[in-house]
């Protein structure tokens, strides 16, 4: 049956990557198998030969080319990582050879990791290799794969990934490699006779850790760390053994403040583990300041418990280990020392587990479940040394679990990835496992249980923490001889007592699974939620650990059985999680006391996501307890040990509209339907698990779309967990701060918004209510056909079917564990004409009569009544129905089609439902749009439907990047937008993911808002028609897609362009080239959010439609760029002086500066911020963003036009801090005026000449001697001529340009000692303090200043890029704190934090700094007596100023003065003073990026060539194929310089003024291309083929270096 998982759509497959399965926790075992499309692992066309597409022949496969790809000729411009073979047999194959060809920047710290094929986290490598220090872009290494615990299956799919060492960016990935291991064990199904084999070679170890201390931890910039320990027990990495309840135990130590040598005194931690487990200790920095500026990771230690046992056996109690790294690029230092003591050992010889299939009787009072309930309500005890002694052999004897009248079986729910047939085998106590179910266990466990220690003690030892798998046993019904009433009352009491504690403990728990009993049958459900961990152990160690723990007579299969039965016979297996020691204060709680406030009682499942800690797993109050608990007589529920309680019949449910619902305490018509709802694997590592919480709807299950995999039990609550998944889609939004929503990925419903409720009159047991109750809970009589297509979708009924009425008859058999992927029971009777079945937010089916516009809970028959609805006898109830359906119209929604995964189920919203004031047209529109989702997301039909919805004018309008520009131009609409929180929320949701438009398209506020932009004077688009309904309301018919809508299609932005009156606001946005592993372009070009979205979303489609057009810069992007100016606070305070006192608003601006669009979106509803930004409307609109300074990968063209440079070579990163000035026209005017004044004052005009005769091999020394020999006046006035020795070329500016290019490369080269790189990750340079040791260094800096001046007055560009403070020094401007951002970002952030926060009693600083000179650290005072002057809140401003001055000027004051003096010996200071630092940077250095469009548009042709000539087309195709570095070399080859003037290629200069780039037809086809740098001309022979042209051009560009004279 696993084969059917292959049909699951690729969109959501990545959501399952973090799921661990009960059958085996390792990522490469059966539970981690993926049936994925091979295309998912393809990267470019030339790699397909390495892939086997569905086992077919290796024939050619084509994939659609992205229209954003700059290389439309070949794929060679993309980074690649190739592997020599796609198959590898361990021990038989030759070693793999990994080839890399990286187009982006490379680093000596780059590394290649080996990963499982579905691994997405870079730290979870199986193995890695550093690629060496040669720094080449191409190379290869040999990789030998040994048999290890990674490859425990006959076949394992892996891949290799290349990561950049500095940034951690993924550069390239290989296709998949299949590793075959012939020695891998083959798992088989188990029989009863296997359960008693080999049970004597396992033991559980109880041990304690104490006396922790660390030495030499990593120190931050200003602050010593505040370290604490995070200790956990995890299954052995890639272990063949299963995840068990003790896995995931976690402890946290206290925080030791401000030290690199912490000692944790009087702290002892107790754990229970197997020898094969791994003890993980992570050292982290608490850093409780308001703005974290350092990495919190200080190091980690992963140690097999077996290693500690071996050390213990030889007498070593205190052990010490060096801390390790998560990634090869992590900087970790220090050691960790601790004491390891064994406190007790549970030997299997003492704990033989009876696996007899003969039933034994026992009293329920003696069961561990009862003991658990008795002690479950108490507070978890604090850790004590004696607690570890509670694990004693005599306390864990043989036991018996009560057996009911029928057979008793324990069923482990299957992992999400495995859908095996599981059937109960009757009286034999056997459970048959489907053929695909390797690793799954189903066995009867019947044993006597002796008195056990309290649940708190055991829960303390088996603390199921953040990464735990939880196997909680709940006490269900008593045996036949036991009364159930006292137990029910006890459960109710315990539920109330434990409620508060449970809420606190749910924050970081994994999926809590329950064992529930109904009709004498136990059902054990296991789930594993464990983060994948990096492999920090050598392969040999893991093999040793497994070998030392395995005995010969015992197989992993029988070990699984014995260990599992041992653990789950112990009361500790039923213990909940002890309270987290530290997390409660750190993590955000989204639901604190709602359960007490609303009286909602039932907590069913905890499904915590690390990024979205969800505590709101409760039942909607609409589900009356009397009827909402199928599978439990009397509706009672036992409580969890940690207080996850149920209320039972004695605690009435309260809610928005359930007050009038009578209790049906004795009604058990749905009894036995299904008894659990939590998913076996609810955790998804790659998706936000959205939830809703309100006073009127609480879900009892995980809402993540990945939770439902077609193999769960239906819910014992009002609705199944499958149905409840729709709540996350059907909730409206709250008026609370969007930041909460962004942080927790929750959708909240305000209390005033009531969820739709059931008809109160119908709660009479056997009426239509019972009809709906049965449906979500699934059905007993289920055929195996449902197994055929397990899907990751929310639906588990077939369309058009209705529930079976149970008529109050209890069912004696629970449904077998099998996939359910349809929402409707199996009734094939069609609905009458004009009727439609829909599902509300609680998963209940209701029926819509489109003729009478009414709805009903009862399924209509062919002889339906004319009015189509059984009317209520009460006017009040009818009004309630009307109010509810008005709410439904706004709140109801359907699941996305991707979650349906081929089930073709229809889930539709009652958009025009009865009572809601809707119309037929509205309902038809809803039907039309929602029909798009009946087919699978990847089917051709569905693609066509999505395309139709894509054409929706409203979608185009809202998702257009210029939406906010149009919004700000419409004053009335802008006022509506800013005053409506709900409207903002809807707009942001749709902009974030256009598929959300389906949810909101009939919202009245949204429709009215969009229609405010419609121009009614225009004609309707082709295929549209306007009509009027019975109420006189206009609606629009789209005959193209056969849909109706109330939204006027005559809204702007339909062609991707702004209206004419707004075109002046367009500012073209640079597009960035993307390599493997980076975010999608869709996410970047969407105006409101930078979150990546699925590639086939509507926005992506819109994006691809208009890819060829120049996309305008979104308004939000302009705001972010405007706020990121260095001097922004001074600018803001000029117009709003109160900003200086408003620290909250300043912090918000800082947040936007740091987080970008994501932060702006969160704060978009902040009134103060909106008012402040409104004062700068014009400045924001006219601002050309400073993108490159904050996004080093962005490429800037001279005209800010869209250009995608396919790769950014290392040389181009030097331009990362350069950008156009804020007011481009102003700067252009300054530049023209500057050159005009230079010419008027005679600078560089002659008649005298400066003749420089240069030898290429002595360029620097020869130039120094000649330039320094000229006087100041000669340098200013004379013309410049450059001649290279031995080269007869005349200098009509070509040689001069090359001279400055070559000279700047040497003079400003950091390796010559005068200058240094400003930071490790940028190529901007600054004056080096070490230059003081260079002989005659001040004269060299004076010479450097003269060269800068000569280049400026003769209008040549330098190939050197300096920091912003350097240009300020040239202009003799003072530096401020903002300038450090370009110099040292981390240093700037640290000082900025000091400036913005109160540092009283936080920092222990004096007015001193530490300087390192040749390895020796010395202390220097920032002012006289600084060593004795403490930095306080009062004098911190002075400290910051002096630190900035020191950081900018440290050791370079004299050098800077000498350089500035030389600069002004050539240039008049009064002329240069018109520029600011950014503008001067552009005048001196230009921009190094190549805009191909600008280049081609400003190219001339001679000799018969023209732009359409075949050779010319080949030429530009070759240039497009070049990477950016090759393009720069081509430009240098033709023009003499690789720099481009600010004005673009149109401003290229020749010997006598402006001269465009020119290509002339010249020469024989055997000749190489020839260049005339004085005239910017390329002589290009008419080559007969593209390949010849490419080779010749590449040879000329890369090999030619001298001039010749014609």
UniProtKB/Swiss-Prot annotation:
GO terms for biological process: negative regulation of canonical Wnt signaling pathway; protein ubiquitination; regulation of dendrite morphogenesis; ubiquitin-dependent protein catabolic process. Residues 354-373, 651-663, 751-765, 806-815 have a biased composition (Polar residues). InterPro entries: C2_dom, C2_domain_sf, C2_HECW, E3_ubiq-protein_ligase, HECT_dom, Hect_E3_ubiquitin_ligase, HECW1_helix, HECW_N. Residues 182-318 form the C2 domain. Residues 380-392, 589-600 have a biased composition (Basic and acidic residues). It is an enzyme of class 2 (transferase). Gene3D superfamilies: 2.20.70.10, 2.60.40.2840, C2 domain, Hect, E3 ligase catalytic domain, Hect, E3 ligase catalytic domains. Transmembrane segments: none annotated. Residues 870-901 form a coiled coil. Residues 1271-1606 form the HECT domain. Residues 349-418, 459-538, 566-672, 730-815, 894-938 are annotated as: Disordered. GO terms for cellular component: cytoplasm; cytosol. Its EC number is 2.3.2.26. It catalyses: S-ubiquitinyl-[E2 ubiquitin-conjugating enzyme]-L-cysteine + [acceptor protein]-L-lysine = [E2 ubiquitin-conjugating enzyme]-L-cysteine + N(6)-ubiquitinyl-[acceptor protein]-L-lysine. PANTHER family: E3 UBIQUITIN-PROTEIN LIGASE HECW1 (PTHR11254:SF79), HECT DOMAIN UBIQUITIN-PROTEIN LIGASE (PTHR11254). This is E3 ubiquitin-protein ligase HECW1.
């Amino acid at each position: 049956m696993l084969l059917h998982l292959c049909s699951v759509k690729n969109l959501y497959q990545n959501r399952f990557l973090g799921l661990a399965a009960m059958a085996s926790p390792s990522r490469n075992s059966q539970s981690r198998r993926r049936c994925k499309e091979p295309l998912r692992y393809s990267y470019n066309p030339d790699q397909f030969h390495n892939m086997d597409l569905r086992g077919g022949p290796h024939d050619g496969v084509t994939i659609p080319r992205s229209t954003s790809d700059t290389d439309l000729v070949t794929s060679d411009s993309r980074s690649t990582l190739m592997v020599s073979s796609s198959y590898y047999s361990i021990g038989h194959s030759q070693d793999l050879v990994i080839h890399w060809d990286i187009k982006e920047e490379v680093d000596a710290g780059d590394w290649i990791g080996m990963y499982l094929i579905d691994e997405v986290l870079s730290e979870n490598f199986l193995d890695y290799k550093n690629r060496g220090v040669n720094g080449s872009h191409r190379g290869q290494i040999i990789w030998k794969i040994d048999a290890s615990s990674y490859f425990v299956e006959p076949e394992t799919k892996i891949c290799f990934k290349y990561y950049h060492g500095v940034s951690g960016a993924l550069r390239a990935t290989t296709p998949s490699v299949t590793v075959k291991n012939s020695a891998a064990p083959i798992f088989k199904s188990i029989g009863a006779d296997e359960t008693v084999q080999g049970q004597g070679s396992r033991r559980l170890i109880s041990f304690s850790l104490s006396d922790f201390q660390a030495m030499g931890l990593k120190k931050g910039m200003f602050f010593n760390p505040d370290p604490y320990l995070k200790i956990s027990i995890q299954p052995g990495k890639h272990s063949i053994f299963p995840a068990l309840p003790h896995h995931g135990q976690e402890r946290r130590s206290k925080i030791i403040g401000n030290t690199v040598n912490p000692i944790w005194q009087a702290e002892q931690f107790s754990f229970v583990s197997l020898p094969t487990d791994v003890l993980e200790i992570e050292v982290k920095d608490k850093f409780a300041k308001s703005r974290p500026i350092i990495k919190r990771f200080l190091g980690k230690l992963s140690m097999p418990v077996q290693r500690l046992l071996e050390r213990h056996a030889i007498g070593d109690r205190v052990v010490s280990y060096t801390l390790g790294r998560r990634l090869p690029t992590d900087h970790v230092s220090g050691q960790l020392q601790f004491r390891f003591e064994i406190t007790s050992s549970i030997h299997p010889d003492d704990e033989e587990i009876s696996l007899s299939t003969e039933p034994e009787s026992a009293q329920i009072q003696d069961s561990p479940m009862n003991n658990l309930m008795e002690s479950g309500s108490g507070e978890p005890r604090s850790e004590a040394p004696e607690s570890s002694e509670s694990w004693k052999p005599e306390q864990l004897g043989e036991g018996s679990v009560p057996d009911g009248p029928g057979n008793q079986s324990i069923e482990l729910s299957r992992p999400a990835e495995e859908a095996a047939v599981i059937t109960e085998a009757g009286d034999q106590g056997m459970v048959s496992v489907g053929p695909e179910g390797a690793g799954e266990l189903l066995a009867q466990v019947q044993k006597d249980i002796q008195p056990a220690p309290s649940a708190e003690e055991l829960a303390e030892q088996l603390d199921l923490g953040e990464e735990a798998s939880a196997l909680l046993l709940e006490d269900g019904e008593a045996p036949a001889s036991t009364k159930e009433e006292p137990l029910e009352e006890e459960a109710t009491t315990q539920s109330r007592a434990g409620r508060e504690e449970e809420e606190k403990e749910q924050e970081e728990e994994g999926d809590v699974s329950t064992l529930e009993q109904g009709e004498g049958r136990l059902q054990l459900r296991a789930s594993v939620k464990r983060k994948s961990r990096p492999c920090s152990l050598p392969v040999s160690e893991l093999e040793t650990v497994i070998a030392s723990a395995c005995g010969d007579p015992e197989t992993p299969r029988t070990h699984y059985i014995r260990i599992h039965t041992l653990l789950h016979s112990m009361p500790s297996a039923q213990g909940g999680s002890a309270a987290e020691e530290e997390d409660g204060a750190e993590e955000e709680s989204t639901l604190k006391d709602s359960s007490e406030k609303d009286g909602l009682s039932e907590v069913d499942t905890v499904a915590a996501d690390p990024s979205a800690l969800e505590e709101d797993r409760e039942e909607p109050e609409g589900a009356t307890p009397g009827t909402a608990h199928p599978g439990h007589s009397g509706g009672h529920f036992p409580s969890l040990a940690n207080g996850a309680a149920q209320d039972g019949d004695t605690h009435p449910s309260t809610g928005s509209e359930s007050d009038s619902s009578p209790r049906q305490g004795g009604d058990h018509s749905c009894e036995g339907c299904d008894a659990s709802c939590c998913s076996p694997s609810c955790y998804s590592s790659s998706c936000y698990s959205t939830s809703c919480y309100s006073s009127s709807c609480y879900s009892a299950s995980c809402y993540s779309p990945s939770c439902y995999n077609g193999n769960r039990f239906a819910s014992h609550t009002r609705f199944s967990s499958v149905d409840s998944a729709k709540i996350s889609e059907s909730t409206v939004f709250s008026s609370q701060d969007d930041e909460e929503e962004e942080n927790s990925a929750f959708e909240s419903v305000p209390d005033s918004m009531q969820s739709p409720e059931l008809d109160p009159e119908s709660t009479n047991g056997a009426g239509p209510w019972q009809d709906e109750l049965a449906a979500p809970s699934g059905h007993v009589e289920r055929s195996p056909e449902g197994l055929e297509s397990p899907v990751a979708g929310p639906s588990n009924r077939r369309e058009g079917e209705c529930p079976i009425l149970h008529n109050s008859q209890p069912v004696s058999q629970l449904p077998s564990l099998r996939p359910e992927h349809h929402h409707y029971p199996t009734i094939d009777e069609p609905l009458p004409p004009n009727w439609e079945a829909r599902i509300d937010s609680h998963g209940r089916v209701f029926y819509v009569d489109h003729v009478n516009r009414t709805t009903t809970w009862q399924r209509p028959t062919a002889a339906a009544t004319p009015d189509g609805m059984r009317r209520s006898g009460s006017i009040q109830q009818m009004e309630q129905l009307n109010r509810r359906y008005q709410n439904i119209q706004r709140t109801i929604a359907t699941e996305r089609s991707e979650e349906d995964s081929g089930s073709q189920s229809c889930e539709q919203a009652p958009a025009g439902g009865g009572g809601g004031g809707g119309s037929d047209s509205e309902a038809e529109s809803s039907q039309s749009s929602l029909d798009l989702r009946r087919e699978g997301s990847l089917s051709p039909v569905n693609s066509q439907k999505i395309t139709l919805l894509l054409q929706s004018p409203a979608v185009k309008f809202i998702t257009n990047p210029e939406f906010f520009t149009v919004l700000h131009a419409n004053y009335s609409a802008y006022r509506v937008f800013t005053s409506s929180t709900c409207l903002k929320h809807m707009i942001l949701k749709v902009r974030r993911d256009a598929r959300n438009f389906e949810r909101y398209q009939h919202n009245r506020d949204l429709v009215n808002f969009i229609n405010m932009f419609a121009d009614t004077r225009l004609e309707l688009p082709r295929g549209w028609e306007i009509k009027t309904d019975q109420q006189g309301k206009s609606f629009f018919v789209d005959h193209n897609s056969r849909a109706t809508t109330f939204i006027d299609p005559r809204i702007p932005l339909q062609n991707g362009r702004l209206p004419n009156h707004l075109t002046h606001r367009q500012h073209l946005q640079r597009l960035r080239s993307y390599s493997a592993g980076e975010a999608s372009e869709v996410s970047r070009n969407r105006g409101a959010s930078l979150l990546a979205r699925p590639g086939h979303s509507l926005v992506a489609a819109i994006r691809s439609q208009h890819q060829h057009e120049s996309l305008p810069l979104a308004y939000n992007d302009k705001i972010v760029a405007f706020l990121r100016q260095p001097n922004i606070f001074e600018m803001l305070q000029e117009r709003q002086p109160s900003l200086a006192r408003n620290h909250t608003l300043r912090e918000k601006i800082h947040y936007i500066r740091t987080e970008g669009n994501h932060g702006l979106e969160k704060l978009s509803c902040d009134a103060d911020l909106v008012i402040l930004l409104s004062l700068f409307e014009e400045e924001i609109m006219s601002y050309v963003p400073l993108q490159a300074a904050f996004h080093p990968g962005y490429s800037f063209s001279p005209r800010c036009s869209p250009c995608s440079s396919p790769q950014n070579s290392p040389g181009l990163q030097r331009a990362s801090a350069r950008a156009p000035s804020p007011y481009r026209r102003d700067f252009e005017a300054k530049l023209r005026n500057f050159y005009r004044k230079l010419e008027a004052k005679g600078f560089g005009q002659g008649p005298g000449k400066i003749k420089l005769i240069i030898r290429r091999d002595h360029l620097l020394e020869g130039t120094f001697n000649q330039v320094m020999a000229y006087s100041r006046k000669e340098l200013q006035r004379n013309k410049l001529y450059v001649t290279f020795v031995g080269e007869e070329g005349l200098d009509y500016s070509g040689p001069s340009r090359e001279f400055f290019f070559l000279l700047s490369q040497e003079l400003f080269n950091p390796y010559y000692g005068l200058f240094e790189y400003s930071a490790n990750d940028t190529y901007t340079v600054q004056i080096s303090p070490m230059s003081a040791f260079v002989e005659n260094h001040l004269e060299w800096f004076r010479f450097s200043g003269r060269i800068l001046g000569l280049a400026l007055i003769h209008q040549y560009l330098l190939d050197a890029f300096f920091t912003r403070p350097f240009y300020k020094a040239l202009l003799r401007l003072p530096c401020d704190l903002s300038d450090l951002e370009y110099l040292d970002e981390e240093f700037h952030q640290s000082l900025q934090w000091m400036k913005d926060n109160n540092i009283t009693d936080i920092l222990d600083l004096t007015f001193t700094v530490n300087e390192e000179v040749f390895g020796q650290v010395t202390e220097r005072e920032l002012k006289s007596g600084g060593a004795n002057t403490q930095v306080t809140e009062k004098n911190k401003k002075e400290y910051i100023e002096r630190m900035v001055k020191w950081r900018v000027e440290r050791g370079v004051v004299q050098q800077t003065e000498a350089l500035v003096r030389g600069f002004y010996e050539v240039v008049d200071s009064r002329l240069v003073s018109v520029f600011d630092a950014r503008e001067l940077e552009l005048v001196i250095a230009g921009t190094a990026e190549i805009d191909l469009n600008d280049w081609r548009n400003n190219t001339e042709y001679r000799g018969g060539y023209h732009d359409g000539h075949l050779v010319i087309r080949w030429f530009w195709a070759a240039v497009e194929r070049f990477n950016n570095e090759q393009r720069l070399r081509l430009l240098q080859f033709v023009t003499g310089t690789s720099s481009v003037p600010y004005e673009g290629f149109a401003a290229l200069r020749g010997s006598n003024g402006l001269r465009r780039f020119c290509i002339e037809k010249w020469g024989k086809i055997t000749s190489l291309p020839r260049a005339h740098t004085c005239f910017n001309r390329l002589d290009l022979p008419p080559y007969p083929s593209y390949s010849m042209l490419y080779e010749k051009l590449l040879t000329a560009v890369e090999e030619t270096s001298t001039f010749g004279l014609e």
